[in-house]
């Protein structure tokens, strides 16, 4: 968001200078030479505690422990001081130190093993309680509005990947694929507009035309913590209209005594009867003469083979006086998914000032699926015997298809850097190389289609789906070969980043100056190769390669019919290649229509200051990002279906965004934290939207007069620009709970939607068109998103035994949005924005038993725009999950889980919930296993 949107640039510079001057005067203090430096440790586990609040009682000076549990308070006069450490879920600990006129006083604060508030017997800070306490402490001491989820909490539900895990957080939902979470939606903002980082460093996405990162590629086992920042500070990448999602992997310095943990799981899927499995192992250790070196190695692998069934309606139109789908599609999926994750982190701390690191993260996600489908176009020919809910047609067409596809996504991230901290100065240097690739070595589509009058039929529309009956619909001899398309895709994105951050601490931790810069370059390409065959020289019927379809399709409610036997069809193709007629025109166009090359460079710099003014911590600053990008893609030109040219088109964009922000944090009373923030963020357009691709189809209707259509990208697109207002009130409960309220508002300029324009009597490329229809993405005017977030978590340790092991976690989000969209007068929400989100989890932890029952709710959201009244929505979804574990002995647990207990499907509808567009069913899954720690 350009600052000139709110006030002139000159006025902003004057205001920023005044603010900086005021902050510096407020921070003026005499520099002393003494320093207290130490770390905070969990007495039970030896883990170093991040986010502990430290305070020197004599002068009120404060600090917060970093990830290694370390903290420092410098510039102290000689004398005796009392240091107190506070951490959610633990009793405060104090220690007295004597500081000389110069030098460093080391200190170690060990927080006790019992939760505060009661005598808890064998309830120690482990499992769900410790996970909740750590996440709440990160949230409590954060300088901005953040949600956190620790590794233990991730493992307390049957979450297969990072997306499944974070949907439990306030204001967060997910879009699912085949029953698993895939993309994260923060506060109703599309996943393309979120920033994803690993250990705070940028991470690319492997998919072809989008910027989103599919978090189902990350096994949840290799993650130490997930953080979602909802209000960004100037030192964070600004490409995050929704928020910034940070995946944190383990460090050997998290637990100086070393650690190791792993698990093995085997499961059962009710739909397929198959047995998925998974295993993971992580190990971390310090070594060297002074434990100055640290290494963490982690490996995770899972295999899941399962099935799903889908029924989908075609486009709705008037049929016999009703709005009905003009066709119905039956799809049966057989899927194998494998996930592999590897973490290799290396660190070196030669002394208290220096830390050097090299973090390596690798994930591999392989999806191998076969999809059988039957499409029935029933409303052909003459309609007779019509009633309000049924009728008979003299014609009908069937299409039987098989899609065999394998997609492999790999993500590699190498993040290396150093931190130097001495006295008030902290310098961070970092560099990133990231490689993201999506390889489709096989996508083969076989299609057999009947004549238009092959299947006279009767239909009934009394239920959510049509009941279509035709006596010969399942006769494979009625389906001649139509085409086979063979495709490979190679998507590659290489990302390079260099940056630094320099911080100068003034008289206490909340008072500092900070500045930094970062350069990011992305090189992305998409190369598709298609080979199409659209006929045979001699007749080829489905009956020659048919197989038996599923016997229990859609829980035996529908009959599927014959399918394409893939090995048999491939054998016929291989042995009779000369019989298949190639289609060179569509081979070329399908191969080039998605191809592009992108080079995008972003140079960013920021400055910020933090000051505590009358009990309120103020962080104010500005970030400037300059984007410089060049693109190339193909211009496909077709006259009467014949390809006439494929020139390469070039394009580019240049723009600068000035992004100020102010964050306020106050603790007006013990355990109450108030926050407010004004921030500005951007969302760069998707690659497929902004590259200069064009598909130009036209016909000559008379001499020198043409009619045609254009589908193209738009290099002139502006980025989304979002002005964000946030407020939150957080009250922290004893022993480890919270009641919180959050309000947010986003004013978003330049949202991007596809627009179709009909032009009459116009000239383009030197040719006269009586009608030219152009479809391309364009910036709409503006839109808003606003919402309320409620969160409650508590551990009921005050109840009598055995009920003192109970706990509850519940959150809800109410959201609304609207946008001004060309050609529409109705109220249009943002894509994937749900009006309501909610999570409820009841857990119990005592006597070595840990159990959690959790319900996740998401209301419907807009998926795609069609004609008014027929927009595509994803319907409400409520999923119930359960997991329990039992500690057999110290370090060894057995566990079991059930996912999707209520057998919740995924549904879509068109405009009105009565117009069901599709329903996909997965059934429930169960798993059991053993975990260990050493």
Model-derived regions, located:
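Short, acidic, small-residue-rich periplasmic hinge/interaction motif at the N-terminus
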Residues: 41, 45, 55, 86-88, ...
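Short, acidic Ser/Thr/Gly-rich low-complexity loop/linker segments typical of extracellular
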Residues: 59-72
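Extracytoplasmic beta-strand/coil segments of soluble accessory domains associated
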Residues: 163-202, 230
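Outer-membrane beta-barrel translocator/receptor signature
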Residues: 207-212, 221-228, 235-318, 323-326, ...
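Short loop/turn motifs that connect adjacent beta-strands in outer-membrane beta-barrel proteins
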Residues: 236, 252-258, 288-293, 353, ...
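Outer-membrane beta-barrel signature, preferentially recognizing the C-terminal barrel domain
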Residues: 394-413, 590, 594-603, 653, ...
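Gram-negative outer-membrane beta-barrel transporters
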Residues: 743-748, 757-759, 763-862, 902
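C-terminal beta-signal and adjacent terminal beta-strands/loops
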Residues: 857-864, 885-934
């Amino acid at each position: 968001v350009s600052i000139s949107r709110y006030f002139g640039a000159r006025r902003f510079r004057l205001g920023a200078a005044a603010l900086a001057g005021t902050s510096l005067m407020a921070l003026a203090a005499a520099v002393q030479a003494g320093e207290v430096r130490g770390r905070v440790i969990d007495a039970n586990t030896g883990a170093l505690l991040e986010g502990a609040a430290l305070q020197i009682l004599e002068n009120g000076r404060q600090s917060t422990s970093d990830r290694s549990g370390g903290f420092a308070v410098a510039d102290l006069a000689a004398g005796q001081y009392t240091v107190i450490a506070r951490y959610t879920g633990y009793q405060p600990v104090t220690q007295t130190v004597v500081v000389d006129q110069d030098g460093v006083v080391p200190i170690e604060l060990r927080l006790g093993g019992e939760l505060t508030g009661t005598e808890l017997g064998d309830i120690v800070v482990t499992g769900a309680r410790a996970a909740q306490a750590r996440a709440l402490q990160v949230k409590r001491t954060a300088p901005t509005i953040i949600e956190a989820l620790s590794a233990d909490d991730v493992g307390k539900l049957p979450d297969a990947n990072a997306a499944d895990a974070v949907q439990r957080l306030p204001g967060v939902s997910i879009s699912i694929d085949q029953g698993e979470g895939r993309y994260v939606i923060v506060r109703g903002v599309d996943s393309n507009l979120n920033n994803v980082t690993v250990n705070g460093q940028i991470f690319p996405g492997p998919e072809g035309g989008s910027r989103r990162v599919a978090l189902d590629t990350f096994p949840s086992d290799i993650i130490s913590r997930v953080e979602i920042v909802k209000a960004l500070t100037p030192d964070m990448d600004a490409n995050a209209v929704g928020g910034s999602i940070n995946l944190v992997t383990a460090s050997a310095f998290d637990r100086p005594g070393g650690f190791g943990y792993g698990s093995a799981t085997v499961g059962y899927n009710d739909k397929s009867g198959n047995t998925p499995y998974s295993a993971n192992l992580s190990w971390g250790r310090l070594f060297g003469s002074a434990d100055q070196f640290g290494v963490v190695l982690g490996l995770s692998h899972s295999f899941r083979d399962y099935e799903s069934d889908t029924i989908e309606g075609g486009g709705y139109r008037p049929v016999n006086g009703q709005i009905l789908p003009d066709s119905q599609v039956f799809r049966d999926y057989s899927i194998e998914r494998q996930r592999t994750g590897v973490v290799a982190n290396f660190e070196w701390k030669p002394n208290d000032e220096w830390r050097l690191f090299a973090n390596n993260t690798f994930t591999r996600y392989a999806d191998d699926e076969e999809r059988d489908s039957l499409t029935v176009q029933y409303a052909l020919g003459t309609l007779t015997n019509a009633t309000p809910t049924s009728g008979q047609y003299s014609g009908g067409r069937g299409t039987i298809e098989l899609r065999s596809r394998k997609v492999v996504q790999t993500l590699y991230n190498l993040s290396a850097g150093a931190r130097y901290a001495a006295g008030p100065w902290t310098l961070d240097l970092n560099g990133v190389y990231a490689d993201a690739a999506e390889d489709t070595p096989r996508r083969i589509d076989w299609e057999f289609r009947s004549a238009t009058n092959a299947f006279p039929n009767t239909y009934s529309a009394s239920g959510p789906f049509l009941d279509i009956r035709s006596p010969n619909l399942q006769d494979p001899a009625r389906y001649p070969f139509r085409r086979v398309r063979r495709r490979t895709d190679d998507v590659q994105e290489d990302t390079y980043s260099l940056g630094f951050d320099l911080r100068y601490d003034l008289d206490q931790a909340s008072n500092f100056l900070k500045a930094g810069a970062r350069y990011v370059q992305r090189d992305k390409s998409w190369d598709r190769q298609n080979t199409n065959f659209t006929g045979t020289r001699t007749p080829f019927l489905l009956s020659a390669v048919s197989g038996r379809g599923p016997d229990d399709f859609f829980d035996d409610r529908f009959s599927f019919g014959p399918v394409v036997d893939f090995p048999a069809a491939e054998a016929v193709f291989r042995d009779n290649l000369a019989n298949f007629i190639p289609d060179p025109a569509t081979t070329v166009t399908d191969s080039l229509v998605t191809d592009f090359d992108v080079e995008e460079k972003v140079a960013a710099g920021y400055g910020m200051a933090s000051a505590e003014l009358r009990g309120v911590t103020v962080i104010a600053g500005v970030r400037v990002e300059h984007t410089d990008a060049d693109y190339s893609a193909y211009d496909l030109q077709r006259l009467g279906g014949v390809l006439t040219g494929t020139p390469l088109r070039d394009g580019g964009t240049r723009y600068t965004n000035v992004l100020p922000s102010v964050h306020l944090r106050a603790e007006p009373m013990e355990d109450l934290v108030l926050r407010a923030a004004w921030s500005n963020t951007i969302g760069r357009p998707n690659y497929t939207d902004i590259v200069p691709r064009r598909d130009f189809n036209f016909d000559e209707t008379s001499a020198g007069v043409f009619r045609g259509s254009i589908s193209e990208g738009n290099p002139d697109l502006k980025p989304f620009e979002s002005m964000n207002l946030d407020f939150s009130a957080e009250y922290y409960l004893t022993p480890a709970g919270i009641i919180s309220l959050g309000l947010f508002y986003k004013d978003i300029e330049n949202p991007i939607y596809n627009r179709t324009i009909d032009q009459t009597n116009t000239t383009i490329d030197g040719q006269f068109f009586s009608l030219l229809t152009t479809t391309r993405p364009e910036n709409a005017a503006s839109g808003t998103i606003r919402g309320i977030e409620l969160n409650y978590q508590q551990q009921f340790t005050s109840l009598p035994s055995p009920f003192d092991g109970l706990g509850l976690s519940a959150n809800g989000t109410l959201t609304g949005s609207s946008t001004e969209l060309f050609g529409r007068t109705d109220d249009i929400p943002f894509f994937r924005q749900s009006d309501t989100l909610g999570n409820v989890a009841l857990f119990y932890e005592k006597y070595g038993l840990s159990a959690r029952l959790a319900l996740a709710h998401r209301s419907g959201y807009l998926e795609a725009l069609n004609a008014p009244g027929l927009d595509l929505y994803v319907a409400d979804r409520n999923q119930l999950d359960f997991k329990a574990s039992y500690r057999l002995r110290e370090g060894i647990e057995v566990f079991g889980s059930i996912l999707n207990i209520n057998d919740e499907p995924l549904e879509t509808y068109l405009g009105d919930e009565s117009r069901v567009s599709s329903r996909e069913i997965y059934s429930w899954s169960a798993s059991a296993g053993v975990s260990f720690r050493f």
